[in-house]
């Protein structure tokens, strides 16, 4: 498995370089940025529709990053539903995973052709079957079945490598592509093993690594579908800035969901999930520090930590069935969102209007409130929908923020890089 700090350090460096290379004077005539999910990704899951074909390297990368990363988390949660023997949640997870696989295959087919998309889908579906078999074997303590599922997953990785080499017309070697997927399958097996052993700290650490690994794999899959000179656009600093923020903000959304749901599972799992929320907050704070300097980064960390606390206070109130505390938490969340929106608007010199960013953060909070309410009521299908819609919406926020940073912000790095504190303050009262 990759070193835990690898992606975070990469993102911090990218944020600093990208802001330096792409900062431009603010223009009074610049249109107000959107805070909705990007058109290439947004609004599809609620209606269970198709995905619009990407026409540019940036659009395709954004799609594949989203779909690979989200698919990873759907698979993780589906495997855990097997381990915990929660059939109602498993039914919802199975359905969402199947549907998302079809949509992912549609994105791949749009990039590489329908025939290659269909071949990819067969490989991916086989992988899902083997992940499920692995989880069932772990749950049943069946060593022979576990080994058979592992062998199947490694064969799936080889099949993916052969497919990718052919689909990319040799731009990617089969062995290199297979190695990427071998890392993926090993991570998902490792998290299942850790979760079954109640080593929740390890399970959630590996889950986060798996999300980041497949987000990056999505970028690579997108690049390989274009000639090298066209694909080079994805190496531009502003594109790396976009990808860095999208990865971290999407990860924030997903880790909050994990932690809110872990509220119902008991303190050990809650603390393990919350630790990864804090690690994500630390990474976001470092990224902000690379762009705006350590003083502003500390302001961000404080505002973001309040945002996190409000969301987790709400889920605690839901778990306790405390209507008064739920109402109080919602009121506090509105104040936290306003403070965070003011900070973000200020650092980009009002290039990002206060109203839209406040509304976007409020929508983010609402997605998380709705999903935990649905989860608590065992409306697992609704909870899944809120999860997917909320993830897409956060990618839209990332694009909006990157656009504003690109137009206005220059990094203010101290000697030795950004010196910020560590993490948010996710905790259960």
Task: Write out the residue ranges for each language-model feature.
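Bacterial N-terminal signal peptides that target proteins for export
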Residues: 1-9
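Preference for long, well-ordered alpha-helical segments
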Residues: 180-225, 360-409
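Short, low-complexity, disordered segments immediately C-terminal to signal peptides
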Residues: 22-44, 415-420, 425-428
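Immediate post-signal-peptide N-terminus of mature secreted/exported proteins
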Residues: 38-95, 228-275
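Alpha-helical segments in soluble extracytoplasmic regions
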Residues: 75-165, 213, 256-347, 390-394
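Alpha-helical rod/repeat scaffolding segments in eukaryotic adaptors/tethers
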Residues: 53-58, 83-91, 113-117, 142-146, ...
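C-terminal motif of bacterial Sec signal peptides marking the signal peptidase cleavage site
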Residues: 17-20
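Long, amphipathic, charge-rich alpha-helical segments that form helical bundles/coiled-coils
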Residues: 70, 116-142, 152-159, 170-196, ...
């Amino acid at each position: 498995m990759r070193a835990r700090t690898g992606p975070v350090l990469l993102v911090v460096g990218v944020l600093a370089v990208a802001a330096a290379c792409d900062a431009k004077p603010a223009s009074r005539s610049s249109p107000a940025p959107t805070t909705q999910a990007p058109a290439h990704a947004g609004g599809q899951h609620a209606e269970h529709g198709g995905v619009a074909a990407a026409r540019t390297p940036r659009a395709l990368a954004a799609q594949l990053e989203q779909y690979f990363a989200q698919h990873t988390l759907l698979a993780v949660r589906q495997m855990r539903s097997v381990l915990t023997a929660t059939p109602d949640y498993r039914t919802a997870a199975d359905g969402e995973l199947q549907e998302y696989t079809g949509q992912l295959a549609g994105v791949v087919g749009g990039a590489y052709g329908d025939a290659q998309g269909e071949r990819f889908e067969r490989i991916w579906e086989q992988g899902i079957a083997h992940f499920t078999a692995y989880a069932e074997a772990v749950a049943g303590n069946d060593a022979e079945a576990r080994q058979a599922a592992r062998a199947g997953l490694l064969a799936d990785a080889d099949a993916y490598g052969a497919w990718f080499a052919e689909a990319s017309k040799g731009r990617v070697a089969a062995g290199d592509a297979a190695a990427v997927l071998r890392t993926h399958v090993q991570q998902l097996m490792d998290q299942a093993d850790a979760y079954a052993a109640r080593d929740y700290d390890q399970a959630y650490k590996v889950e986060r690594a798996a999300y980041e690994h497949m987000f990056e794999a999505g970028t690579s899959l997108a690049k390989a579908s274009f000639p090298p000179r066209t694909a080079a656009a994805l190496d531009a600093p502003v594109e790396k800035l976009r990808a860095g923020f999208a990865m971290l903000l999407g990860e924030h959304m997903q880790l909050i969901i994990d932690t809110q749901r872990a509220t119902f599972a008991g303190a050990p799992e809650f603390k393990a999930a919350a630790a990864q929320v804090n690690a994500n907050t630390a990474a976001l704070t470092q990224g902000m520090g690379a762009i705006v300097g350590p003083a502003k980064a500390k302001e961000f960390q404080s505002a973001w930590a309040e945002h996190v606390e409000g969301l987790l206070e709400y889920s605690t109130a839901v778990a306790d069935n405390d209507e008064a505390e739920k109402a109080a938490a919602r009121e506090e969340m509105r104040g936290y969102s306003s403070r965070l929106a003011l900070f973000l608007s200020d650092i980009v010199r009002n290039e990002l209007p206060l109203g839209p960013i406040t509304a976007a953060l409020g929508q983010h909070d609402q997605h998380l409130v709705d999903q935990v309410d649905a989860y608590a009521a065992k409306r697992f299908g609704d909870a899944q929908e809120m999860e997917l819609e909320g993830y897409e919406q956060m990618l839209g926020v990332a694009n909006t923020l990157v656009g504003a940073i690109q137009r206005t912000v220059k990094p203010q790095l101290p000697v030795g890089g950004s010196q910020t504190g560590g993490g948010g303050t996710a905790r259960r009262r």
